[in-house]
Amino acid sequence: MEPKTKKQRSLYIPYAGPVLLEFPLLNKGSAFSMEERRNFNLLGLLPEVVETIEEQAERAWIQYQGFKTEIDKHIYLRNIQDTNETLFYRLVNNHLDEMMPVIYTPTVGAACERFSEIYRRSRGVFISYQNRHNMDDILQNVPNHNIKVIVVTDGERILGLGDQGIGGMGIPIGKLSLYTACGGISPAYTLPVVLDVGTNNQQLLNDPLYMGWRNPRITDDEYYEFVDEFIQAVKQRWPDVLLQFEDFAQKNAMPLLNRYRNEICSFNDDIQGTAAVTVGTLIAASRAAGGQLSEKKIVFLGAGSAGCGIAEMIISQTQREGLSEEAARQKVFMVDRFGLLTDKMPNLLPFQTKLVQKRENLSDWDTDSDVLSLLDVVRNVKPDILIGVSGQTGLFTEEIIREMHKHCPRPIVMPLSNPTSRVEATPQDIIAWTEGNALVATGSPFNPVVWKDKIYPIAQCNNAFIFPGIGLGVIASGASRITDEMLMSASETLAQYSPLVLNGEGMVLPELKDIQKVSRAIAFAVGKMAQQQGVAVKTSAEALQQAIDDNFWQAEYRDYRRTSI
């Protein structure tokens, strides 16, 4: 259902003159009416012509096209965001296909690497370990009292780029931009946070422009105590907030999620969001092929927290489709840099232990090696689905893809690593190596592939199809927790919007132009499941839909009325 157009109430504003123009959430620039210019002491501070937001957006689009590099376009858009947020979101929504890769992956990776160099204006909250005893004061300095979504990172595992220190702040800023652009969550309700616990990136420590705490990262008890102080301070200031953990290192991501997911409404997008969008994609791809996900054999390259999170959600989905847990686990094979995970492998991480294959069941495999490589696994398993979350480029070789295709007429290949430079194989190569038969979904955006005069659209398995809808659903329903069932409902809803399933052709995932519609549908499904799970107050379907409508922010100016502080 599309959001209803409703008359916005006037806002009563105590600020005036140049001060008002400095508020990105309130600034309208040349769109202030003549009456507003008189009432707010703006006469003479703006050019004479009063413009509409569409006229402003057209000028901004022309200016944007004048920039030649993606990083310069990113800097330009961030400048608009820090000047006039309403215009920023109107512009982005007008050109989402073009601009999403610029405000988020892959360009945000370069923006994180160059954060201190391209820094213009502060956005969000920087909490350094040096200021840990001022945590409550720091959060009290945030002027917005009604924060509903926080995205927090410690900058240690930024995309596939590793430790970027406080440069990781680019990720929460970008993620929250998508919460608004795709999920309709008002920017006034969002807060990006970076926990500055030092950096082990020597290049940053030696950089005279680096703006973070110049110290090796704190670890162990010091680290977890610091994060806990942050969580407790957040609960004190905004007890009902949704907290998203973002780009934490593998060694910390799962422990933090497990520790806090039942203490505060929280989730980890790298683990749970990636899993949800991947499972939604696989459900749709399986249906398009006339089957179910439970019928497929799946091989992963990459057995970190993200890969294992996806695998566990796939297992949950195939159990929902009728498999026993044992049968579901026997269909999933995890390969990391040491080979296939088996019960004889030492030094497994806690979240890997349930995803091993029993070595005794592999005695008839065609291999002489003790270390079972990806090629060994593909040759013996004969998988239907190959998923890459390794963060290493080129590991899906021609030999591996052709071996897979030899036994699977319509292979599903998903090189999900970000950014583009880390992808396991390009869609162009995968399509060519499978004679045009592979169904490909990637983690980063790729242009359609042309092979033998046929055009193959490439779906981006983008978490933006999932997390904005989850956020909107949590806010609209008032959910106190995010359960696994809520995530599964998001995956199922995403699959229902697949053009390939609905029309028998096109991409396996919806087009970006439909992302707000998809987010609203996911919000409803998530909110309804929250009610069924007992983590939100039960209401009628009509009341939940109305709450979604009421919370869906649109990039439109509102009339201002003057008031005193």
Swiss-Prot record:
Q: What is recorded on activity versus pH?
A: Optimum pH is 7.2 to 7.5 for L-malate.
Enumerate the residues marked as the site Important for activity: D270
A single GO molecular function term of this UniProt record:
identical protein binding
Per UniProt, the cofactor note for this protein states: Divalent metal cations. Prefers magnesium or manganese.
Give details on activation and inhibition. Answer: Non-competitively inhibited by high concentrations of NAD(+) and L-malate. Also inhibited by CoA, acetyl-phosphate, palmitoyl-CoA, and oxaloacetate. Activated by aspartate.
Query: Which co-factor is required?
Result: Mg(2+); Mn(2+)
Q: Which residues bind a divalent metal cation?
A: E246, D247, D270
A GO biological process of this protein is: pyruvate metabolic process
One cellular component term (GO) for this entry is: cytosol
Q: Does the keyword Oxidoreductase apply?
A: yes
The alphabetical list of record keywords is: Metal-binding, NAD, Oxidoreductase
Other comment: Can also use NADP(+) but is more effective with NAD(+).
Indicate the quaternary assembly.
Answer: Homotetramer.
Q: What is this protein called?
A: NAD-dependent malic enzyme
Organism listed in the record: Escherichia coli (strain K12)
Which gene underlies this protein? maeA
